[in-house]
Amino acid sequence: MRSARYEAQHSRAASETSKAIAAANSPLYRRQRGYFTRVYEAGGPTPWPSTEPTPSVVKVARLLKRRVRGGRVLDLGCGEGRHTLLFAKAGFSTVGLDYLLAPLKMVATRARQARLARRIRLLIGDALLPPIKPDTFDLLVDYGCFHHVKKADWPNYLDAVLGLLKPGGYFHLSVFSTKFKHYPGERRTRNWNVHRNHYDRFFVKRDFARIFGGRCEILAIEEEHKGLDGFFHVLMRKPSGMLLRTDMGGR
């Protein structure tokens, strides 16, 4: 006979899954998906970097290579796979996850050309509903996903994504800072907007302790600002034990 504790846990898990499904299929996220789909269908250069890995992520690859032998890496929202290929080349078993098929096909082609296909697994799925078992990865890289997630959906993201890390695993996050501009002279009166049908969130340094401090140890925060680009690159580590969750609400 199942215990009341089991039933409560099962009910809570089912409720969280239902919320994640509803969030992933919200009108805003459907429009956002449509925006990225159209960019790939256009067939030209993307508005974001798509070939060379970002220096901050290269640093993390070097760090992981020194500390973990034969580790597993998840590139969340991998796009055309510039970081997926980086970690595979460094010798790691790497999973590239994206919710669009078009960029995954590009990764597959690049992996074959670089003779890295045996180290790479590609999955189609949403960050809020990743089709992966918990406690799987030594490192999770999110370059440019979290800043497209509404604040109301952060708890779903944290549950889904951080749960994929092994205890003691590393989490590298790259997101827009408030210095990011879509175009010269852009003015904003709030820390989020909807631009060309996709949601963008802009962060300041103190945000990361508030959002992630209840679940991760923050190891380093690097700010990058060049031209219109403004980013924070944050390296965190999931503790071996359980930390308190951070309560968040709002937009």
Regions flagged by a language model, labelled:
Residues 128, 132-140:
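A short acidic, Gly/Pro-enriched loop at the edge of an enzyme's catalytic core
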Residues 2-74, 79-131, 149, 153-156, ...:
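Class I (Rossmann-like) S-adenosyl-L-methionine-dependent methyltransferase catalytic domain
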Residues 139-152:
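A short SAM/SAH-binding and catalytic strip from SAM-dependent methyltransferases
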